[in-house]
Every structure is written in structure tokens, then in C-alpha cells.
């Protein structure tokens, strides 16, 4: 059975770094969600305009399809995207199961305190997501609770390496349980 692992959370939690590391540790493909945003979404975010639900649906569908397709290489793939709301996570699961009915979807949601993320984003250069938009992400954020296949991981002041190890441990437990 294939598994699609989605690493999410608000901008600045390190999901791209953690997701890429996880894919290396699991020896499976990595799909960076930011690479699949249409230019219209990038333009909005670059100008400090938060995305709406309508801006996200096509992007989430395309990203999920790419991730599901990538599982055919090794039986697993890691995808990163914010998946801030329950309805986004449900949509990802729906699309994944439509594409591959027996796929397992594991969602690893990284979250942190606003001030920690704001400080980290203030030091980040060259990314289209500006720290001025962090407030809108926190307004939208629904941390998973008792949600099938979803695990919330609080980052705190942990290093990216420590978070990566925690994420890998959860992923391996779930992957072992599916075999």
C-alpha cells in the first residue's frame, strides 16, 4: 500500500526543510508545495495579500495528484504544503483516495508560537511569503485534534534536526503499522 506523507503548518515552521530531510531518510520522492503555486497565487502573496479558499483548491488538487503519482516510484512520497484548515486536509485525503483508492495519507502538522515564527521569518530572505502575512495564517490555522491520520507536532525552540527526528519517528511508526 502506498503512503503519501504531507508535512504542513504555517509558513516559517520549517516544513520544507523537515519534508526534504524526511524524504531523504525514507528514500522517497519529495514534492515542494510552493513550486506548484500558480503565478497568480505567488503574485498575491508577494504583495501581502492572503490567499482565499478559492485560490487554494486547484493548487491543492494538482499538488496532491503530483504527490500520489510520486508514490509509484518507491511506495511513498513526501509533500509539503500549509494545509492550515481541516477542510484542506480533508480535500487532500479525498483527492489522494480518488487517484489511488488504497493509499494511506499521513499528515504531519508542524506548529509553533507566533513570536517564534515571526522572528524566524524576519531573518529569512528571498521567499515570497512575507512575515506580514503570518497573522492571516494564524487566523486560519486549525491544529489537528483527533483527526484521522494527522499528527500535530509543536516545534517550540527545538532545532530543525530534533523536529526532523520526531517527524521521522512518527512516519516510521505509521509506515510499520500499515505493513
Which ranges hold each PLM region?
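Hydrophobic anchor at the beta1->P-loop junction of P-loop NTPases
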Residues: 7
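Conserved substrate/cofactor phosphate-moiety recognition/catalytic segment
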Residues: 17-68
Amino acid at each position: 500500500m502506498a503512503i503519501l506523507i504531507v508535512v504542513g503548518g504555517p509558513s516559517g515552521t520549517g516544513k520544507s526543510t523537515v519534508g526534504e530531510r524526511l524524504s531523504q531518510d525514507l528514500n522517497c520522492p519529495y514534492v515542494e508545495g510552493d513550486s506548484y503555486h500558480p503565478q497568480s497565487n505567488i503574485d498575491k502573496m508577494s504583495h501581502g495579500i492572503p490567499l482565499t479558499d478559492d485560490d487554494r483548491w486547484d493548487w491543492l488538487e494538482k499538488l496532491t495528484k503530483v504527490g500520489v503519482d510520486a508514490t509509484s516510484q518507491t511506495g511513498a512520497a513526501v509533500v509539503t504544503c500549509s494545509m492550515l484548515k481541516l477542510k484542506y486536509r480533508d480535500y487532500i485525503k479525498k483527492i489522494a483516495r480518488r487517484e489511488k483508492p488504497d493509499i494511506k495519507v499521513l499528515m504531519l502538522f508542524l506548529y509553533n508560537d507566533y513570536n517564534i515564527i515571526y522572528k524566524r521569518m524576519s531573518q529569512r530572505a528571498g521567499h515570497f511569503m512575507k512575515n506580514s502575512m503570518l497573522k492571516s495564517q494564524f487566523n486560519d490555522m486549525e491544529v489537528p485534534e483527533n483527526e484521522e491520520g494527522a499528527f500535530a507536532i509543536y516545534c517550540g525552540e527545538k532545532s530543525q534536526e530534533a523536529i526532523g527526528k520526531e517527524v521521522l519517528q512518527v512516519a516510521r511508526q505509521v509506515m510499520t503499522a500499515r505493513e
